[in-house]
């Protein structure tokens, strides 16, 4: 006859009990950055979730950090907020130490690398992207892993729906698997910069499609556009279900 495990049985008392606190969570959402010839775009949806619950329908994921540098750290929202605040403080201290000299985008990338690497034993659980203009006035997008490894890219998506959006960006921005008509797939289309209008349309299409397929993305879309004249913001509604 099978023994029923209870609080008094040996089977129950021998079962290991897990006493563990998980300090991390995933609050959903998606971000993406695209670099243009003389501009850069960073976008993110505004949904904040825990499991199947929506915590907020407006939780911004993209931030203007000054000096024509915009930033997003998506994943665990508390870690993302902490990293953005630390970087904004770094920008202020750079101004104090260098007589209000502007921080360049490549120096910003190196600074964020140090912030992330310094926390490598208890990392910020985020995918980080920054965007801005380089010394030549060209758009620049840098993406980071949680411990500080980074690279400059033409475009990058991160977060819940990155696996849905990135193949679309590879095709439409990096022109992967695109060939000149009439060449039977032998002559690749040359890379070219897209206009601001084309990029914003791609961003909106990317997020509109992602909201149809991923429950962690939706509600609103914030887009920050960086040009030599500064940073401007655009907002568009997304699906709320």
Swiss-Prot record:
Record's GO cellular component terms: cytosol; nucleus; proteasome complex; proteasome core complex, beta-subunit complex
Propeptide: 1-19
Summary of subunit composition and partner proteins: The 26S proteasome consists of a 20S proteasome core and two 19S regulatory subunits. The 20S proteasome core is composed of 28 subunits that are arranged in four stacked rings, resulting in a barrel-shaped structure. The two end rings are each formed by seven alpha subunits, and the two central rings are each formed by seven beta subunits. The catalytic chamber with the active sites is on the inside of the barrel.
Location(s), subcellular: Cytoplasm; Nucleus
Keyword Transmembrane helix: no
Any single biological process term in GO: proteasomal ubiquitin-independent protein catabolic process
Gene: PRE7
Chief localisation class: cytoplasm
Domain of life according to the entry: Eukaryota
Organism, scientific name: Saccharomyces cerevisiae (strain ATCC 204508 / S288c) (Baker's yeast)
Transmembrane region(s): none
Keyword annotations of the record: Cytoplasm, Nucleus, Proteasome
Family, per entry: Belongs to the peptidase T1B family.
The keyword Cytoplasm is annotated on this UniProt entry: yes
InterPro entries membership: Ntn_hydrolases_N (IPR029055), Proteasome_bsu_CS (IPR016050), Proteasome_sua/b (IPR001353), Proteasome_suB-type (IPR023333)
PROSITE patterns (UniProt xref): PROTEASOME_BETA_1, PROTEASOME_BETA_2
Name of the protein: Proteasome subunit beta type-6
Function: Non-catalytic component of the proteasome which degrades poly-ubiquitinated proteins in the cytoplasm and in the nucleus. It is essential for the regulated turnover of proteins and for the removal of misfolded proteins. The proteasome is a multicatalytic proteinase complex that is characterized by its ability to cleave peptides with Arg, Phe, Tyr, Leu, and Glu adjacent to the leaving group at neutral or slightly basic pH. It has an ATP-dependent proteolytic activity.
């Amino acid at each position: 006859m099978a023994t029923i495990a209870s609080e008094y049985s040996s089977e129950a008392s021998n079962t290991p009990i897990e006493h563990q606190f998980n300090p991390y969570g995933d609050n959903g959402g998606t971000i993406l950055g695209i670099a243009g010839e003389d501009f850069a775009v960073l976008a993110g949806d505004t949904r904040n979730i825990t499991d199947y619950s929506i915590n907020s329908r407006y939780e911004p994921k993209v931030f203007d950090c000054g000096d024509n540098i915009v930033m997003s750290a998506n994943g665990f929202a508390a870690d993302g907020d902490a990293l953005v605040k630390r970087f904004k403080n770094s920008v202020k201290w750079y101004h104090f130490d260098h007589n209000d000299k502007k921080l360049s985008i490549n120096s910003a990338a190196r600074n964020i690398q140090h912030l992330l690497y310094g926390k490598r034993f208890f990392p910020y659980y985020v995918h980080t992207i920054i965007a801005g203009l380089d010394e030549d006035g060209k758009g620049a997008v840098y993406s980071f892993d949680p411990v500080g490894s980074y690279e400059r890219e033409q475009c990058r998506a991160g977060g819940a729906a990155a696996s849905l959006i990135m193949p679309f960006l590879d095709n439409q921005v990096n022109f992967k698997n695109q060939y000149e008509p009439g060449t039977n797939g032998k002559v690749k289309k040359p890379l070219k910069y897209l206009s601001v209008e084309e990029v914003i349309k791609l961003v909106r299409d990317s997020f509109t499609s992602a909201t149809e397929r991923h429950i962690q993305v939706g509600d609103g879309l914030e887009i920050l556009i960086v040009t030599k004249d500064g940073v401007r913001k655009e907002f568009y509604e997304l699906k709320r279900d």
